[in-house]
Amino acid sequence: MAAEQEVPIVIEGGKLVDGTGKPPVENAAVLIEGNRFKTISRKGQFPYPKNAQVISAGGKTLLPGLWDTHVHYRDWMAEIFLAHGVTTILDLGNPSTWILAQRDGVAKGKIRAPRIFACGDPIGEGHGKRGDVKGAGEAHALAKKLLGEGVDAVKVWAHCTADMLKVVAEEAHAAGRKVIGHLGVLTARDAVLNGLDCLAHATGLPMSAVKDSEKAQWMLNQEIKRLQTMIIGEPGITAWGLFAMMEEDTFDQVADFLVSRHVRIEPDFVYRWQLASRRREEREYEDFITFSDPRLSYIPPVTLTRNMRAWQVYRRLNEQQLTELNEGYEKFQKFLHRFVRAGGEVDIGTDTSEGRMPGKGVHREFEFLVDAGFSPKDIIVWATKGSAEFLGKGDELGTVEAGKIADVIVVNGDPLADIRALGKIDTVIKNGEIVDIGYHPDYVNPIPRPYEPSLHSYPVPKIARIAPAMAVEGSKPVALAIEGEGFVRGSVVHFGGVRVRTTCTSGKELQAEIPAHLLSRVGTYTVLVANPGPVNIKDPLHEDERSNPKYFMVTFN
């Protein structure tokens, strides 16, 4: 354990970028005793303990350990985060009992992983997942329960209404906790007026950046519709278009309002705008190489499929969609500059989840921000000091300063000159201990995450009934209605083992056309529904991506 470590550590000779925003210290020397920074100075300016382990950092840069403030943690992610220099994460949605057990296991030194702060269940109405509540009363009760369990912040999700958010925020703020929101049914302005502290993905912003109230309501209705019909694995095309509709002459007023309320924005370029990157093809190839690494064989297939499919989406975009993507991207960058110039604080989050690679996203977010015109110095402060201060941990974490917990990384090169140097990790020290940053194919988390359907894979379909369930031999084509759940665009009906034309009318209904040649022989035919991959198939009660069977009979004429 870090507190029991007897050998002090000295890192000497590199450039120190301490995370405070102050000018870097050349030829620095940093002394770590136990799990704390003891002395921060220059090489040769103080005596080293005789038994110190000395790490030479000549030509390298020392920085605080990095943060990712938007993660949906999975049990296999730990060492990948650490290998990318991410020493602290904020989890914004997981089963509360499991993520708090992970947090506490890491804090006790029992799990080799980044430090975890957690929100537990996200609070919202009608989304059918953990944290699904009805009305302000249930929302308040859940917030109180989560805070009683010791969560570090509270997350509200897309279907959280104004009344619900107000009582959740009051409860959270009374406990000294922040409220973070992935908005859907609320504009950013309405959410902030009801107590929101941070806009995850900058959600709700477009509707607040137009002057006409009817236009804003139309945009909000489009977002609600998108949420209701969203197929996980498909791009948020309409969302790009909403950002493209923002009116630039509103930007100063909106930015000033958010800053006056001390609201942060998490841009999350890697979540919404990755297809707008000029490094798109380079990153696609990089992902391919990463997933080919045999040391990472424990990464679930859903993550591989989700990542690689996301890049392929770009090749299918039509002209209108490309216009929405590019115009929305440009306007969002302009707004973010107005926001920062007005004094706004930016959170560095990636929405890392079962469908996205841990660690790598943080470095891509840095590159996005530099491409957008922000300075590496500011970005580093946002990803370290700013993150710690947002959670009220600034006295202990976030910077390389004497007395603080010793989270520090050493990178090859100078990220102030080239932000990509942040990805060239040489050494990671977390809580005063040198971290093994290698990958190990036998990595196992001692507390595996309980199975539950993923937001980043398709559901397992289930058939409740079919109609009709019978035809006579030699019939004309039959229009087969299938009711159930877990249906998505891309669901396919199999009739007697043969794929047939299928239309998804909703998540609970499919229409299939059974051609006449399949009705030419008497018999009992199996009807199944198969969803496209990746599908949640880890449930031991369900072995593949197909539904339960129903039966269709063809009788004698």
How should these model regions be labeled?
Residues 452-492, 524-529, 535-557:
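Beta-strand/beta-sandwich contexts
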Residues 57-110, 127-129, 134-137, 163, ...:
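Metal-associated gating/positioning segment near the N- to mid-region
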Residues 145-153, 160, 205, 209-372, ...:
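Active-site neighborhoods of metal-dependent hydrolases
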Residues 78-98, 113-123, 147-160, 169, ...:
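Divalent metal-dependent hydrolysis catalytic cores, especially in the metallo-beta-lactamase
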Residues 7-10, 16, 20-63:
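Histidine-rich, glycine-flanked metal-binding segment
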Residues 431-464:
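Extracellular/periplasmic ectodomains of large secreted or surface enzymes and adhesion receptors
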Residues 516-522:
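Surface-exposed, short loops/turns at beta-strand junctions within beta-sandwich domains
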Residues 16-29, 42, 357-360, 375-380, ...:
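Acidic, glycine-enriched loop/beta-strand segments at the rims
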